[in-house]
Amino acid sequence: MAAAAAAPGGGGGEPRGTAGVVPVVPGEVEVVKGQPFDVGPRYTQLQYIGEGAYGMVSSAYDHVRKTRVAIKKISPFEHQTYCQRTLREIQILLRFRHENVIGIRDILRAPTLEAMRDVYIVQDLMETDLYKLLKSQQLSNDHICYFLYQILRGLKYIHSANVLHRDLKPSNLLINTTCDLKICDFGLARIADPEHDHTGFLTEYVATRWYRAPEIMLNSKGYTKSIDIWSVGCILAEMLSNRPIFPGKHYLDQLNHILGILGSPSQEDLNCIINMKARNYLQSLPSKTKVAWAKLFPKSDSKALDLLDRMLTFNPNKRITVEEALAHPYLEQYYDPTDEPVAEEPFTFDMELDDLPKERLKELIFQETARFQPGAPEAP
């Protein structure tokens, strides 16, 4: 299968084209939309794809593999948060090996720590992403089923490594012309830790609001793998209707969208909310009745709606797991537990990155990328 790059720190990006590309001269650095890409001589013929908060993505011709690739130019070193996300993504993707998770083919950077201003991450080139695809067409049930299977197949691997993606959304699902799908953008990923404290009621959370599980907004600790399943449920609903199911404008609006469809939580579900302020807020709201999925999606496959219901369950303890979702009747034609690999061992971060200064994070990025430098020993 093929793989690719998404615009760092952002969603879709602009359509691919030759605008802003300066023709290459041997020995010179190519410039894309004013940005120098110091990636020669192996990578040439750059074309702009898109850009995000702290970098730009271009396609390029790889003279070794004889194919076009995607190159992310990341310039994160002025900001602790960008350094943190860059390091986390590199750490995870260099250790992951799965057909439905984006891989890293190569990393280019300056030969010394002092000279390192940018990092170039080379990945397989994908033609589009699910966000762009849903903007342009209504998917058939067959396509929805196949894309959902691949999302869950990749997520099974991620979760088996004890990692939460935490930012699953259509623009982070890359797709090529043969409908292969790869999950990308692991900058917000974390080790699954149900006991880690996430302080505060309705404090700002970095992942895209529309795909956030309700417990993220309501609890101060207890994030589990079920938050990713909620996001996949939101993505399935969006594939069925070509519009986001919970497009909240802010926190409380987001909760109101969710409760407006799922109905008021039961007393048992309220009991799983450990934050008393949040629980009291929910109990103060007028009672709401659940809306039938078939009413929202009258033309959709009934098995798809049953799986959707099991994913978009308010109580994370009752939400379907990724293994259970793969075995659901809706995905029967693809389900093959012998071809749904898991990680060889749980992923562990050597240290908590949140508290490290950007200078230390830069050193760690330099170390993590050393294996790609000329003369470095082959990676295992």
Swiss-Prot record:
Q: Tell me which residues bear Phosphotyrosine.
A: 205
- N-acetylalanine found at: 2
**Binding residues for ATP:** 49-57, 72
Q: Which residue numbers delimit the Protein kinase domain?
A: 43-331
Q: Which residues carry this modification: Phosphothreonine?
A: 199, 203, 208
Compartments in which it is found: Cytoplasm; Nucleus; Membrane, Caveola; Cell junction, Focal adhesion
Q: Which UniProt keywords apply?
A: Acetylation, Apoptosis, ATP-binding, Cell cycle, Cell junction, Cytoplasm, Kinase, Membrane, Nucleotide-binding, Nucleus, Phosphoprotein, Serine/threonine-protein kinase, Transferase, Ubl conjugation
List cofactor names only.
Mg(2+)
Entry annotation: catalytic residues: 167
Q: Which PROSITE patterns match?
A: MAPK, PROTEIN_KINASE_ATP, PROTEIN_KINASE_DOM, PROTEIN_KINASE_ST
Q: Which GO terms describe its cellular component?
A: caveola; cytoplasm; cytoskeleton; cytosol; early endosome; focal adhesion; glutamatergic synapse; Golgi apparatus
GO MF annotations in UniProt: ATP binding; DNA-binding transcription factor binding; identical protein binding; MAP kinase activity; phosphatase binding; phosphotyrosine residue binding; protein kinase activity; protein serine kinase activity
Q: How does it assemble?
A: Binds both upstream activators and downstream substrates in multimolecular complexes. Found in a complex with at least BRAF, HRAS, MAP2K1/MEK1, MAPK3 and RGS14. Interacts with ADAM15, ARRB2, CANX, DAPK1 (via death domain), HSF4, IER3, MAP2K1/MEK1, MORG1, NISCH, PEA15, SGK1 and MKNK2. MKNK2 isoform 1 binding prevents from dephosphorylation and inactivation. Interacts with TPR. Interacts with HSF1 (via D domain and preferentially with hyperphosphorylated form); this interaction occurs upon heat shock. Interacts with CDKN2AIP. Interacts with CAVIN4.
Family (UniProt): Belongs to the protein kinase superfamily. CMGC Ser/Thr protein kinase family. MAP kinase subfamily.
Its domain comment says: The TXY motif contains the threonine and tyrosine residues whose phosphorylation activates the MAP kinases.
Q: What is this protein called?
A: Mitogen-activated protein kinase 3
